[in-house]
Amino acid sequence: MTRKILVTSALPYANGSIHLGHMVEHIQTDVWVRFQKLRGHECYYCCADDTHGTPVMLAAQKQGIAPEDMIAKVRKEHLADFTGFFIGYDNYYSTHSTENKQFSQDIYRALKANGKIESRVIEQLFDPEKQMFLPDRFVKGECPKCHAQDQYGDNCEVCGTTYSPTELINPYSAVSGAKPELRESEHFFFKLGECADFLKAWTSGNNPHDGKPHLQPEALNKMKEWLGEGEETTLSDWDISRDAPYFGFEIPDAPGKYFYVWLDAPVGYMASFKNLCDRIGIDFDEYFKADSQTEMYHFIGKDILYFHALFWPAMLHFSGHRAPTGVYAHGFLTVDGQKMSKSRGTFITAKSYLEQGLNPEWMRYYIAAKLNGKIEDTDLNLQDFISRVNSDLVGKYVNIAARASGFIAKRFEGRPKDVSGSALLAKLAAESDTIAEQYENREYARALRDIMALADIVNEYVDANKPWELAKQEGQDERLHEVCSELINAFTMLTAYLAPVLPQTAANAARFLNLDAITWKNTRETLGEHAINKYEHLMQRVEQKQVDDLIEANKQSIQTASAPVEEGKYEKVAEQAGFDDFMKIDMRVAKVLNCEAVEGSTKLLKFDLDFGFEKRIIFSGIAASYPNPAELNGRMVIAVANFAPRKMAKFGVSEGMILSAATADGKLKLLDVDAGAQPGDKVG
C-alpha cells in the first residue's frame, strides 16, 4: 500500500551559516525521505528558513539593509549549502511568506475562538539604553531551576526548562549589557495548561499507521517530567506575543503586537507545504485536516523538543488540525569528542567543506553510519572519518564494479549473463526486508553495518574466484562471464541499499548500469542480460591533506588574555574580568565518591564525583601532589560544572574541571570546603 507522508526538518535560523551540526539533522531526514521514495511511497520533504525575530532585525540594521533583503540573501546561501550536500527538498521556503502569515493568523483566531488565548498585562524586561522591550533570547542570566549560567530568557539549554525571562536570576541585556528594568505591557497567551490532558494522551500514545509511539522513549520521559503526574500539570501558559519594534507578523486586531517567532516558525512547515501544493497540485487539506489519514513527521534537535512535542501538537489540535504522527529528536554533533570550536577549526561550515573540494557523500555516509533512533550525540572523529570512508566506500563497495566491469565490456560486449539463480545474490536479496526495517526505524548505523557485511561477502567471493586469473586461462570464458555478472549484479544490489545515503553515486551508477534509476526493487531483482555502459570511476579516496586543509580553513583567531609570570613568588594577577564574565562560570560543590590513578598516565587522577543532581567523571592532572588518591575518597571539592567536556586522549571524557591552587613549589592543592556544604551547592 502506498503511504502518503509529509516530512520536515527544523527550520535553520536566517542569521548564520549552515554548519555540520545542521547537516546531521538534514542528512538524517533526507536519508529517511529518500528511502521512502525508493520504496514507492508518496513522500514530500519540506523545509524553510526561520526568518523572524529581533536577531534578524538587529543583524539587518547592522548591515544597513532591510530585513527582507537580508533573509533573501541568507536563504539563497542556505539552499546552496544544502543542495551541495544533496539534500533533496521538495520545497525549501521562507517563514516570511503570505502563506505563513495567513496560517499563523488563522491558527491564532481559531485558538482564540476556542478559548485558548487570553490577554494579560505583564511586567516585561526593558532595555533602558536601547529603549526597547527585550525578547526572551536577548535576556540572559542564571537558570532558575538548575542555576546554569548565561542562559537565554525563554529556556535553559542545560536542563531544558522553559520559563519567563523575569524568572532569570541576575538578568542582563544581551543587546547592551545593561541591567533591564521591569515595565508593563499587554501580551497574549496560549493557555497551554488547559491542553495538558490532550498532551498527556498524545505524548504517550501511538500513531495509527504502524502502532509506533509518537515520541522516542527518552523524549516521552522528558514530557512526563514537564507535564507532571496525575491531574497535576507543571505546564505554564505560553506568551505568544512580542512588542514593536519586531520583524515578524502583526497579531490581528492588536497594533504594535507581533507573533513570537516560535509561534510562526513551526507554522512554516504548513506554509512550505502549501506553497508546494499550489505549485504541483497536491491536496493540502488531506494532509492537515483533523481526521487526516496521511502521515506527518518532524525531525528535530533535542534542544527544541519542548516546542515540537508540547506547543506545536497543542496548537494544531486546538485550532482544528491534525497532530504530528511522530516527532524524532537527535543529539548534538561533537568533533573529536569535543564541542565544535572555531579556534580549533572544528566549527566546520557546509560552505567551507564544499569549497575545499571534499565529496559531500563522504560526510553523508559517515554521519549516517553514526546515527540511530535514539537521542544521542554524534561524534565526528576525523581520523575515523578518513579510514571508514576509504575502507567502506572505496575499498569494499565501488571496487566491486571496478574489478568486474572491464571484463564485461571487453570480453562480453557489455552484456552480463543471466545469473538469477546465484547463491551469492540470494544472500544479498535475503537482507532486503531487514535493512528496510532498519532504515524505517532510523537505525542507519545498523543498516550500514549490515550492508558492509554483505560487501565483505561479495569481496570474499572476488578473492575466491579471482576473475583476473580466470581471464588468463583457456576455456574459462563462461566461468569468467558468470563470476563478473554476479559481481555486477551484487554491486547493483549494494547500490540500491546505499542509495538513500549516497544519492549521487547511485545516480552515476544507474547511468553505468544503463538503468533509468535505482529503486528498492533492485535489492532483489537481477539485471538479466541487460547491457551496461562503460564503467566510470565513482569515488575517490579521502586524503589526510584534504581534512587538514579543511580544519585550517575553518580556524578563527580568538584572542585570549594570558597572565605572564612575574619574577618572584606569585603570578601576576590576570586581566580584569567583568561581572558577566564571572557569572558564566558555574562552580559547584562535589563529593569524591572514588579517586584512583589512571593507568598509562603519570599526571592524571580519575575522580568519580557526586554533584547532587548527577554523577560525573572528571580527570585532573594532580597525581604528583596526591600519591595516595584513595585518601581523597569522601572529600568535598569545588568543580566547574559547566566546563565543556574534554576527551583525554585514550583515557575517556572529562566532564568538568576541579579547582586547585598552585603553590610556589609547583604543587597543586585541592581547595577546602567548609563543613555543612552539600554536593550541588553553588559557589560564588
Curated annotation (Swiss-Prot):
GO terms for molecular function: ATP binding; metal ion binding; methionine-tRNA ligase activity; tRNA binding. CDD domains: Anticodon_Ia_Met (cd07957), MetRS_core (cd00814), tRNA_bind_EcMetRS_like (cd02800). A motif ('HIGH' region) lies at residues 12-22. Residues 581-684 form the tRNA-binding domain. InterPro entries: aa-tRNA-synth_I_CS, Anticodon_Met, Met-tRNA-synth_bsu_C, Met-tRNA_ligase_1, Met-tRNA_synth, Methionyl/Leucyl_tRNA_Synth, MetRS_core, MetRS_Zn. Keywords: Aminoacyl-tRNA synthetase, ATP-binding, Cytoplasm, Ligase, Metal-binding, Nucleotide-binding, Protein biosynthesis, RNA-binding, tRNA-binding, Zinc. It comes from the Bacteria. SUPFAM superfamilies: Anticodon-binding domain of a subclass of class I aminoacyl-tRNA synthetases, Methionyl-tRNA synthetase (MetRS), Zn-domain, Nucleic acid-binding proteins, Nucleotidylyl transferase. Binds 1 zinc ion per subunit. ATP binds at K342. It is an enzyme of class 6 (ligase). A motif ('KMSKS' region) lies at residues 339-343. Homodimer. HAMAP family: Met_tRNA_synth_type1 (MF_00098). Is required not only for elongation of protein synthesis but also for the initiation of all mRNA translation through initiator tRNA(fMet) aminoacylation. This is Methionine--tRNA ligase. It comes from Neisseria gonorrhoeae (strain ATCC 700825 / FA 1090). The lineage of its organism: Bacteria, Pseudomonadati, Pseudomonadota, Betaproteobacteria, Neisseriales.
